[in-house]
Curated annotation (Swiss-Prot):
Enzyme class, broadest EC rank: transferase
Function noted in UniProt: Cell wall formation. Catalyzes the transfer of a GlcNAc subunit on undecaprenyl-pyrophosphoryl-MurNAc-pentapeptide (lipid intermediate I) to form undecaprenyl-pyrophosphoryl-MurNAc-(pentapeptide)GlcNAc (lipid intermediate II).
An example Gene Ontology biological process: regulation of cell shape
Stated name of the protein: UDP-N-acetylglucosamine--N-acetylmuramyl-(pentapeptide) pyrophosphoryl-undecaprenol N-acetylglucosamine transferase
One MF annotation (Gene Ontology) recorded for this entry: undecaprenyldiphospho-muramoylpentapeptide beta-N-acetylglucosaminyltransferase activity
Protein family according to the UniProt entry: Belongs to the glycosyltransferase 28 family. MurG subfamily.
Organism encoding this protein: Clostridium botulinum (strain Langeland / NCTC 10281 / Type F)
Membrane topology: Peripheral membrane protein
Keywords: Cell cycle, Cell division, Cell membrane, Cell shape, Cell wall biogenesis/degradation, Glycosyltransferase, Membrane, Peptidoglycan synthesis, Transferase
Subcellular location: Cell membrane
Chief subcellular location: membrane
Pathway: Cell wall biogenesis; peptidoglycan biosynthesis
Domain of life: Bacteria
Length: 354
């Protein structure tokens, strides 16, 4: 049996695409193992899937000054030695890396063990982890056509992003039942990313009466961001984080407010959900979500509201516009030729398996 080691972590966006590949890889005869960080979100997600998980030391890669920048390189170095030992013992035929800071030591370790590495970059421009890892990769899968020019060494392959099959098979009635909605108002799903979004949470709750006058709300607010004062609010269902329930909640929703991470916007495209994107500002990111959102807005798939312009009036104005023109966005998304990347990436993995 062929063996693959997968890696990726830090946020759910670096983990769920790996899960999307798992059924197809198993069908193709691969035994799957996973290397991730000790305390990252990926550990709980992967172990729940019954995949053997190997934790290693990892340091966060920052673009700003922090005292931890002096100690974290030593954590990365420790992670390289740990990953090298795991890879030498497990003898995988190939490594697949989805990005996030934990992947850098794994990719370097695979290279030192002469194991081919396929990486995947979701955003238009590569993140710092993938930039550091690219020299050690055999090929780098990209999601956007615009991304090809940003990958050095002629390694880029346009594959699209992998989307979990079960996400496309949600049950609308189950989603409504889970939320306890009793009327026929349109449903607004709000996603702030796997770690939540303070600014989106705050403005939604500030305008709750106004929004609830038109919509029922499913609010995925992130860990430790539940508001106990709103637990029994009619028409408002809040969740810290969802996994198995997400397909049903997505299916039940009529509109979506979301950050603009590449994975989630491609999921919205696949599901043809009219969406309002609020990308992370450059104050708190490298600007990748701004580029992702601009690409989808240009294609007519999304309406965009800059974080700097996020106010009570602008939020309600954009929401109302999106709902009134929802069929235009659905029609535009229906014409998209973007592929689910599962098949393309699996074929590439098979091609470069030792």
């Amino acid at each position: 049996m062929k063996k693959i080691i997968m890696t990726g972590g830090g946020t759910a966006g670096h983990v769920t695409p790996n899960l999307a590949l798992v059924p197809e890889l198993k069908k193709s005869g691969y035994e799957i193992k996973y290397i991730g960080s000790i305390e990252g979100i990926e550990r709980k997600i992967i172990e729940k899937e019954g995949i053997e998980y190997f934790p290693i030391s990892s340091g966060k890669l920052r673009r700003y000054f922090d005292l931890k920048n002096f100690s974290d390189p030593f954590k990365v170095l420790k992670g390289v030695f740990q990953a090298k030992k795991i890879i030498k013992r497990e003898k995988p035929d190939i490594v697949f890396s989805k990005g996030g800071f934990v992947t850098v030591p794994v990719v370097i370790a695979a290279h030192l063990n002469k194991i081919p590495v396929i990486a995947h970059e979701s955003d238009i421009t590569p993140g710092l982890a993938n930039k550091l890892a690219t020299p050690y990769c055999t090929r780098v899968c990209v999601t956007f056509p615009e991304s090809v020019k940003h990958i050095k060494g002629d390694k880029a392959v346009l594959t699209g992003t992998p989307i979990r099959r079960e996400l496309l098979e949600g049950n609308k009635l189950e989603g409504i039942k889970l939320c306890g909605f009793k009327d026929n108002k349109p449903i607004l799903l709000i996603i702030g990313g796997s770690l939540g979004s303070k600014i989106i949470n705050e403005i939604v709750r500030k305008n709750l009466d106004n929004i609830l006058s038109k919509f029922n709300i499913i609010h995925i607010c992130g860990k430790s961001n539940l508001d106990e004062n709103l637990e029994n609010r009619k028409g408002y269902a809040q969740f810290e984080y969802v996994n198995e329930e997400l397909p049903d909640l997505m299916k039940a929703s009529d509109l979506v407010i979301s950050r603009a991470g590449a994975n989630v916007i491609y999921e919205l495209l696949a599901l043809k959900k009219p969406n309002l994107l609020i990308p992370l500002s450059k104050k708190s990111s490298r600007g990748d979500q701004i580029l992702n959102a601009a690409s989808f807005e240009k294609s007519g798939y999304s309406l965009v509201l800059k974080e700097e312009e996020l106010e009570d009036k602008t939020l309600m104005k954009k929401l109302n516009y999106l709902y009134e023109n929802r069929n235009v966005y659905i029609n535009n998304m229906s014409k998209s030729k973007m592929d689910n990347g599962v098949k393309n990436i699996t074929e590439l993995i098979k091609k470069y398996t030792k």
